Amino acid sequence: MIRVIMLLVLVWMTPMISWATEVVKDVSGQKVEVNADQLKRGKRLFNTHCSACHVGGITKTNPNIGLDLESLSLATPARNNLDALVDYMKNPTTYDGSESIAQIHPSIASSDIFPKMRDLSEDDLYAIASHILTQAQIQAEKWGGGKIYY
């Protein structure tokens, strides 16, 4: 009887699970809902294009600066919202915002040097940014926290 009830609950919840959304913010602080398909796409793209250096939200080249919300919010300009992260993926700058690092960080601006970036559309960049911000919310300090968590 319990198995039947559990099965019925699972069947009943399946449509709700597929419509699940996460909430991230845009540059004005407005909440933006991101659906499960967008998050799945963002995760796939992140794993393909970003995880060589940012697995688990860390930054292998500078472990002091991760993709956690605190680090993103302390950057200049702040990178803790969708639009700012997309802007960074197009034209990356140093953490203090003073210099372009497009020649050493994969970006749309340097797609001639980093061919993996050539095929990314604006929607792809937003999907990746959604994945990063969602992971930062869900995993909290584990996302970008470095090897103390892995």
From Swiss-Prot:
One Pfam family from the record: Cytochrom_C550
Names of required cofactors: heme c
Disulfide topology: none
PROSITE patterns referenced in this protein's UniProt entry, alphabetically: CYTC (PS51007)
Membrane topology according to the record: Peripheral membrane protein
Signal sequence range: 1-20
Cofactor binding note of this UniProt entry: Binds 1 heme c group covalently per subunit.
Role according to the record: One of the extrinsic, lumenal subunits of photosystem II (PSII). PSII is a light-driven water plastoquinone oxidoreductase, using light energy to abstract electrons from H(2)O, generating a proton gradient subsequently used for ATP formation. The extrinsic proteins stabilize the structure of photosystem II oxygen-evolving complex (OEC), the ion environment of oxygen evolution and protect the OEC against heat-induced inactivation.
Family: Belongs to the cytochrome c family. PsbV subfamily.
Annotated NCBIfam families: PS_II_C550
Name of the protein: Photosystem II extrinsic protein V
Source species taxonomy: Eukaryota, Rhodophyta, Bangiophyceae, Cyanidiales, Cyanidiaceae
Gene designation: psbV
